[in-house]
C-alpha cells in the first residue's frame, strides 16, 4: 500500500505558490510587519481566483485558501472593520458565474469604498493591500477592455482612495497571465507582485512571501510591454479565419530585445527579492555544446533563492537571429546571507542551433550552427545578464538534417532581422506532395488470423507478441479501438473526460482494459463533484524556474491520479504565450519555448515516477480561443520548429512523453487532427515519439482542400492520430472507417498501426495492472473529512422524452453537493424545473447553483416559502452528451427539495444526432447561441411560480 499524505501535498503546493510569486516593485514596504495592522481592499480577497475557466480549471475542491485566509492563518493582523465590510458586500453581491461555458465574466463587481471606512482604516496603520483579480479561459480570450486586460473604473477608484489615504500601498495581481501595468504610472504603488492563480493553496504561499517567511524568487515568464500594441502579434491576433504569424521567430523578448528595447516595462526573467545576489559565471566548450559554471553569492541581509539564466547571442548571418535566446537556467537552494553556491548549466548543440527552412545556408530543412561567434550571457533576467563565454565556429555545422514538414501553403511576408535591422521577406512555402509522402510511409499489414485465444495479458507476460494479438482483431475491433468514449463514460472513474482502449465488449473480452483520461492541467476534473487537488496554474509554475520542485509537486498529483484510477491527465498545456490576451495562457507556461518544454518535462517526470501519464497539448499553435475550431494558424516552418513545436520536442526527447493531444484548429491549411506531417513525420519519424495520440474533444478533421468533418476518422488514422475523442458509445458510431477501408482511402495496416500505438501504451498503465490484479493501491491519508455525496456514482436516470426525479429527502446542508447522471436517449433542448419549499423566514436566502458537466448554468435563490412549493426553471438547456452529469450545490441549508423535471422542448437537428456531437462542442455552440438570442440573463435566471 502506497500512502499519499494530503498535508505534504498541501505543503508542496504552497512552496510552489511562494516560489512563483513575482515581485516587480518594492520601495521598502515588503515584507509586511506581522505585528502591525494591515488593510486589505478588493473583493477578490474573498473570491480568490484559484484558476482560469473551462476544462483546465474545473477542479472541485473542499477548500480554497485565499490571500486574506492565508494572512489570517499565518497570524497577520488585519483590519476587522474593512474585512467585515467586504464580507457584508459579498453576501449581498455573490460571486457571478456568468452565463455558462465560455460566458464567465473576466472579473467580479467591486465594492465602492466609503470615504469614512477608508479614513478610519488609515488611522490604524499606514499600509494597505489592494488585490486585483482576473480570469479567462476556454472559449473566452481576454480583451483589451476594462475588466479584462485593463482596470475598471471601480478598481481605479479603489486605488485612488487607497493611494490618497495610505503612505504604503501594495498591489497584488491574482491573475492567470499578465495584464496592463499602466496603473504603476497613474498610482505609483510602493509594491507590485504577481501572485497569479495558485490553486487551492494560493493564499498560503502568498502570505508567506508577504510576511517575509519566504523571500520572493519568482521570475517573469513573459515580457511586460508598455502597451498591448507593442506586441508584434497584436496586428493579427483575434482574426477569426486566418491568423498570420508574421512576426515569425520574434516572439516575446526575442522581438523586444532585438528590435524594441525601449517598449519594455519589465523584461523577461525579471523578479525582485528581499535580498541581493552576486552572480559570476564562466563557460567552456564541449564536444556537444557548452557548460556554464555560475557562482551565486547572497550579498544581502535576508535568506533567499536566485535563478541563473543563460542566454545565447548567435551570429546574425544568413539566418536572421534574435539578439537573445534562453538556452539554460538553474535555481539555487535557499542561501543565507554571505552563503554561496555553484551551479552548472549544460547547453546542448540542439539548444544553440537554428532551423533553415529555405536553404539560405546551403542546408535546407536542417538544424544548423552558422559560422561566426556565439556569445553567452548569464544573469537574473534577459537584460541584466552579463557576457560570460564565447566561442567562434569557423564553418557552418549541420546538427540534424530533416525533411520539410508542416510548411505553409499560403504566401505571406515574415519578419526578419537583417544587417540593417527589421525587415520582411517572402516565407518559404511547402514543396511536399502530402499524399505521396503518406504512401511512402505505409506500414506492412499483419495478416488477419481470427481469434486464437490470445489475451493482452499474454502479451504483457511475454507469451505472445503484440502483432500476434493484433492479428486477431477484425475491422470492427480496430474501428472501435480508435474511438474514445465519453464524456463521463461508465467504464472508468465517474465524471472523467474519456475512456479509451477497451471501450467495446469484444475488446474487453480480449483483455484490453479501459484507460481513463481526466481533464487537467490544474488538477483532476471530476464532474460528479468528487473533490480533488487544485494546483497552481501553468504561468505560476513557469515563474518558479524550479524544475525539481515542480517534479516533486507532480509526483503527488500522480499518486492522487492513481488513487482515483486516472491513467492520463490532459495536460500539461504547452502552447506559447504569443499574445497576452489568449484566454488559456493561464494553462500554458511562457512566451519562451525552452522554459515551456523544460517545465513540462519536469511535470512529466513527476507523473512518470509513479506510473501515470500527462498528455501534452495542444499540438500545436493553439494560441487563441476566438474561433478556435476553425482558425487557420499560418506560420513558417522555422517559426513552428523554433517556437511552437520546440517545447513539445523537449518534452518528448527529455522526458519521454507518451501521450499527445492535437488541437481544434488548422495549421497551414490542414486541421491538426488529420495532419500526417505533424503526427507522423515530425512527432514520430523525426522526434522518435513512441506513445499514442488523441484528438481534442469532438475535433474537426479534413483532407487537404476539403471541408471539416467530425466523422472523418479515416483521415485521422492515416495521419497516425490514434484515438478520436470522443464518441458517445465506443461500440458504434457514424465515422467513415469501414467505408474508407472498402474504397481504399484507408488501409487495414494503418488501423493496425494505431492499434499498436494504443495497446503498447495501455500495457504500461495502471489500468492494465489493475486488470491483471497486479496494481498496488494508493491510500490518501490526512485528507480533511468532508461532506460527501455517497450515492453520486449510483444515481443514473434514463431521459427518453420527459423525466421526473423525486428529490424528497435530499440533504440540503450548507456547501453540500448532490450529483446525478442522466442517460440521454434523445439529444435536444430541454426545460429543467426544480421545485422546493422552505419553512424559513421570508427574508431567508437559500441559493442552489446548477452545474451540468461541471459548468454553472445558473444560481437560483429560494426565500422562505411558508412551506409552499416554489419552482425555478432553466428555460432551455441543450443536452447532447449521452451521460450528462448534473450537480446541485447548496449554498445554505433549510430547503426541502421536492422534484426535478426535464421536459423536451425540441429534438436535436438530424445532422447533430448523426454526428453524435457532445458536451464540449455543445458548450461552445450554446455560448454563442445565448449571446445571439439573449442579451440579458433572463434565460438563465429561469422562472419562479407557486402552485
Curated annotation (Swiss-Prot):
Organism ancestry: Bacteria, Bacillati, Bacillota, Clostridia, Eubacteriales
GO molecular function term, any single one: beta-glucosidase activity
Family: Belongs to the glycosyl hydrolase 3 family.
Pathway: Glycan metabolism; cellulose degradation
Name listed for the protein in its UniProt record: Beta-glucosidase
Keyword match Hydrolase: yes
Keywords of the record: Carbohydrate metabolism, Cellulose degradation, Glycosidase, Hydrolase, Polysaccharide degradation
Superkingdom to which the source organism belongs: Bacteria
Signal peptide bounds: none
Gene Ontology BP term (one): cellulose catabolic process
Catalytic site positions: 696
Pfam families recorded: Fn3-like (PF14310), Glyco_hydro_3 (PF00933), Glyco_hydro_3_C (PF01915)
Bridged cysteine pairs (disulfide): none
Record-listed E.C. numbers: 3.2.1.21
Enzymatic reactions: Hydrolysis of terminal, non-reducing beta-D-glucosyl residues with release of beta-D-glucose
InterPro entries tied to this protein: Cellulose_deg_GH3, Fn3-like, Glyco_hydro_3_AS, Glyco_hydro_3_C, Glyco_hydro_3_C_sf, Glyco_hydro_3_N, Glyco_hydro_3_N_sf, Glycoside_hydrolase_SF
Broad enzyme group: hydrolase
Amino acid at each position: 500500500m502506497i500512502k499519499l499524505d494530503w498535508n505534504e501535498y498541501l505543503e508542496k503546493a504552497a512552496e510552489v505558490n511562494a516560489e512563483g510569486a513575482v515581485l516587480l516593485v518594492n520601495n521598502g514596504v515588503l515584507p509586511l510587519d506581522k505585528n502591525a495592522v494591515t488593510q486589505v481592499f478588493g473583493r477578490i480577497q474573498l473570491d480568490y481566483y484559484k484558476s482560469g475557466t473551462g476544462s483546465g480549471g474545473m477542479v472541485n475542491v473542499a477548500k480554497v485558501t485565499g490571500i486574506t485566509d492565508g494572512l489570517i492563518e499565518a497570524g497577520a493582523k488585519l483590519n476587522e472593520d474593512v474585512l467585515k465590510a467586504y464580507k457584508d458586500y459579498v453576501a449581498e453581491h455573490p460571486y457571478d458565474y456568468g452565463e455558462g461555458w465560455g460566458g464567465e465574466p473576466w472579473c467580479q463587481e467591486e465594492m465602492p469604498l466609503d470615504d469614512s471606512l477608508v479614513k478610519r482604516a488609515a488611522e490604524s496603520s499606514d499600509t494597505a493591500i489592494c488585490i486585483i483579480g482576473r480570469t479567462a479561459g476556454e472559449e473566452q480570450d481576454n480583451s483589451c477592455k476594462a475588466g479584462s486586460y485593463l482596470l475598471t473604473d471601480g478598481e481605479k477608484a479603489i486605488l485612488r482612495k487607497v493611494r490618497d489615504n495610505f503612505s504604503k500601498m501594495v498591489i497584488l495581481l491574482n491573475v492567470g497571465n499578465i495584464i496592463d501595468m499602466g496603473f504603476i504610472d497613474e498610482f505609483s504603488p510602493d509594491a507590485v507582485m504577481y501572485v497569479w492563480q495558485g490553486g487551492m493553496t494560493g493564499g498560503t504561499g502568498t502570505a508567506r512571501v508577504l510576511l517575509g517567511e519566504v523571500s520572493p524568487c519568482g521570475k517573469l515568464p513573459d515580457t511586460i510591454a508598455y502597451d498591448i500594441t507593442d506586441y508584434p502579434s497584436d496586428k493579427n491576433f483575434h482574426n477569426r479565419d486566418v491568423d498570420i504569424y508574421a512576426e515569425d521567430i520574434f516572439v516575446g523578448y526575442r522581438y523586444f530585445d532585438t528590435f524594441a528595447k525601449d517598449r519594455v516595462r519589465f523584461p523577461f526573467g525579471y523578479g525582485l527579492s528581499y535580498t541581493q545576489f552576486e552572480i559570476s559565471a564562466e563557460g567552456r566548450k564541449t564536444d556537444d555544446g557548452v557548460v556554464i559554471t555560475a557562482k551565486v553569492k547572497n550579498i544581502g541581509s535576508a535568506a533567499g533563492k536566485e535563478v541563473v539564466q543563460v542566454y545565447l547571442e548567435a551570429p546574425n548571418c544568413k539566418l536572421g537571429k534574435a539578439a537573445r535566446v534562453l538556452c539554460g537556467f538553474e535555481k539555487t537552494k535557499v542561501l543565507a546571507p554571505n552563503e554561496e553556491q555553484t551551479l552548472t548549466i549544460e547547453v546542448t548543440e540542439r539548444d544553440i542551433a537554428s532551423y533553415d527552412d529555405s536553404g539560405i545556408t546551403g542546408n535546407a530543412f536542417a538544424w544548423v550552427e552558422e559560422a561566426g561567434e556565439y556569445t553567452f550571457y548569464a544573469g537574473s533576467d534577459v537584460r541584466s545578464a552579463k557576457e560570460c563565454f564565447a566561442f567562434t565556429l569557423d564553418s557552418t555545422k549541420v546538427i540534424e538534417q530533416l525533411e520539410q514538414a508542416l510548411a505553409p501553403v499560403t504566401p505571406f511576408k515574415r519578419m526578419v532581422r537583417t544587417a540593417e535591422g527589421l525587415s520582411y521577406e517572402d516565407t518559404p512555402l511547402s514543396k511536399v506532395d502530402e499524399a505521396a509522402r503518406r504512401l511512402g510511409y505505409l506500414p506492412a499489414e499483419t495478416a488477419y488470423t481470427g481469434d486464437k485465444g490470445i489475451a493482452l495479458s499474454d502479451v504483457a507476460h511475454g507469451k505472445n507478441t503484440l502483432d500476434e494479438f493484433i492479428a486477431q482483431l477484425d475491422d470492427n475491433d480496430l474501428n472501435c479501438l480508435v474511438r474514445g468514449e465519453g464524456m463521463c463514460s461508465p467504464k472508468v472513474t465517474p465524471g472523467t473526460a474519456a475512456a479509451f482502449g477497451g471501450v467495446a465488449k469484444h475488446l474487453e473480452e480480449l483483455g484490453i482494459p479501459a484507460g481513463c483520461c481526466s481533464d487537467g492541467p490544474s488538477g483532476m476534473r471530476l464532474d460528479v463533484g468528487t473533490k480533488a487537488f487544485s494546483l497552481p496554474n501553468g504561468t505560476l509554475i513557469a515563474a518558479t524556474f524550479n524544475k525539481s520542485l515542480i517534479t516533486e509537486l507532480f509526483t503527488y498529483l500522480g499518486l492522487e491520479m492513481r488513487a482515483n484510477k486516472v491513467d492520463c491527465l490532459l495536460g500539461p498545456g504547452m502552447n506559447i504565450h504569443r499574445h497576452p490576451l489568449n484566454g488559456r495562457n493561464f494553462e500554458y507556461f511562457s512566451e519562451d519555448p525552452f522554459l515551456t518544454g523544460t517545465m513540462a518535462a519536469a511535470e512529466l517526470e513527476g507523473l512518470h515516477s509513479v506510473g501515470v501519464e500527462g498528455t501534452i497539448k495542444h499540438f500545436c499553435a493553439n494560441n487563441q480561443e476566438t474561433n478556435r475550431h476553425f482558425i487557420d494558424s499560418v506560420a513558417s516552418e522555422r517559426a513552428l520548429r523554433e517556437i511552437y513545436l520546440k517545447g513539445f520536442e523537449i518534452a518528448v526527447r527529455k522526458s519521454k512523453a507518451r501521450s499527445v493531444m492535437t488541437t481544434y484548429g488548422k495549421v497551414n491549411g490542414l486541421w491538426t487532427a488529420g495532419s500526417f506531417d505533424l503526427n507522423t513525420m515530425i512527432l514520430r519519424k523525426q522526434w522518435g515519439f513512441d506513445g499514442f495520440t488523441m484528438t481534442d474533444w469532438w475535433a474537426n478533421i479534413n483532407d487537404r482542400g476539403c471541408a471539416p468533418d467530425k466523422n472523418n476518422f479515416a483521415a485521422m488514422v492515416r495521419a497516425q492520430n490514434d484515438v478520436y475523442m470522443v464518441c458517445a458509445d465506443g461500440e458504434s458510431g457514424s465515422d467513415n472507417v469501414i467505408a474508407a477501408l472498402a474504397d481504399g482511402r484507408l488501409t487495414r495496416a494503418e488501423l493496425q498501426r494505431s492499434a499498436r500505438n494504443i495497446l503498447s501504451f495501455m500495457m504500461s498503465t495502471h489500468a492494465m495492472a489493475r486488470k491483471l490484479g497486479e496494481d498496488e493501491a494508493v491510500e490518501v491519508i490526512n485528507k480533511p473529512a468532508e461532506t460527501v455525496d455517497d450515492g453520486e456514482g449510483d444515481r443514473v436516470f434514463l431521459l427518453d422524452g420527459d423525466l421526473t426525479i423525486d428529490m424528497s429527502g435530499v440533504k440540503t446542508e450548507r456547501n453540500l453537493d448532490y450529483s446525478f447522471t442522466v442517460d440521454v436517449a434523445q439529444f435536444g433542448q430541454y426545460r429543467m424545473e426544480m421545485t422546493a419549499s422552505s419553512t424559513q423566514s421570508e427574508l431567508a436566502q437559500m441559493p442552489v447553483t446548477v452545474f451540468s458537466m461541471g459548468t454553472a448554468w445558473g444560481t437560483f435563490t429560494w426565500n422562505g416559502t411558508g412551506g409552499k412549493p416554489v419552482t425555478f426553471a432553466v428555460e432551455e438547456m441543450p443536452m447532447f452528451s449521452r451521460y450528462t452529469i448534473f450537480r446541485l450545490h447548496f449554498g445554505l441549508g433549510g430547503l426541502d427539495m421536492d422534484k426535478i423535471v426535464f421536459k423536451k422542448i425540441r429534438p436535436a437537428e438530424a445532422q447533430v444526432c448523426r454526428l453524435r456531437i457532445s458536451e464540449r462542442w455543445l458548450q461552445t455552440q450554446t455560448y454563442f447561441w445565448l449571446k445571439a438570442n439573449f442579451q440579458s440573463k433572463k434565460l438563465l435566471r429561469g422562472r419562479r411560480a407557486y402552485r
